Amino acid sequence: MNSKFADELIATAKAIVAPGKGILAADESTNTIGARFKKINLENNEENRRAYRELLIGTGNGVNEFIGGIILYEETLYQKMADGRLFTDVLREQKIHIGIKVDKGVVPIPGTDGETSTQGLDGLAERCKKYYEAGARFAKWRAVLKIDLAKNCPSQLSITENAHTLARYAAICQENGLVPIVEPEILMDGNHTVEQSAEVTEKVLAAVFKALNDHHILLEGALLKPNMVVNGTDCPIKATSEQIGKFTVRTLQRTVPPALTGVVFLSGGQTEIEATANLNAMNVLPNRPWALSFSYGRALQASVISTWKGESANVEAARKVYLHRAKCNSLAQLGKYTGEESTGSASESLYVKDYKY
């Protein structure tokens, strides 16, 4: 890859996952944030979405020691604080890198059992240019795969198709100065064991990195956003944090080149505390040539939203909750998280069946 942006891409990727730092994924689509607001009986309109994102973006108090990047939805990229400052300017002042979700959602692959491919390659180069000009320095694209061993899912067709589109997206991003976050999410839905999850995740990641190599992706200027290796939600045997850490790190060791700067895990419907504890379990293990960090949406925001409740009087209390969760995950990224009291919302299941983002 001979992009004029090579040095910048490498520096950005390193900064996002510097020691103790990870990503806040705040790029929920309008429909998804609507579902979150519904839980607190809040109308899903542009002003409420703006106010909620101001709560997150306006959090100071050293949040930038824990958060290296924040992924925004396109609407948010152009929104402003109540005092008129652009969200992007506030983030730049805090030296938090700005990311943007660039995929257009999933569509079924014909001839499969409901398996999907991600749309959004058309016009992507132009959009990347526009986002770079608006201050974005990284992007995210989510592919979705599911495990159903009885139906032979994920099929080879689904794996190949999603690996290819992830690699095309990554190449277009790097050409235009954006660090690509490559996200092949294998959903938690199903009754598979943690061992079966490890086997499938290995197969998927091997295909993804073969495609990235075929497309000449600069791995030092890219980040991987995979699922942790966990058992299916309907599996009677629940894996421990230690097992999840061990199987996840082993899977990465077998498939991910050490040239890749970092791996930022999705929380995928784990509780807030599970997502933190499982990340910590990986970071106490040996032989990790990459930064292993977080790119959490629900697992950084669920308690924040339930504390806020849409009331301006609760903004500061909600920001304290956000800071606390960010700090816990920062400690986990360093392998120094020692646990915490499980308050109601922090240990509440965040699982949504067949999760659409």
From Swiss-Prot:
Active site: 183, 225
One GO term of the biological process aspect: glycolytic process
Disulfide bonds: none
Gene giving rise to this polypeptide: fba
Keywords: Glycolysis, Lyase, Schiff base
Catalytic activity: beta-D-fructose 1,6-bisphosphate = D-glyceraldehyde 3-phosphate + dihydroxyacetone phosphate
tRNA processing listed as a keyword: no
GO cellular component: cytosol; extracellular matrix; phagocytic vesicle
Name this polypeptide is given: Fructose-bisphosphate aldolase
Lineage of producing organism: Eukaryota, Amoebozoa, Evosea, Eumycetozoa, Dictyostelia
Keyword Lyase on entry: yes
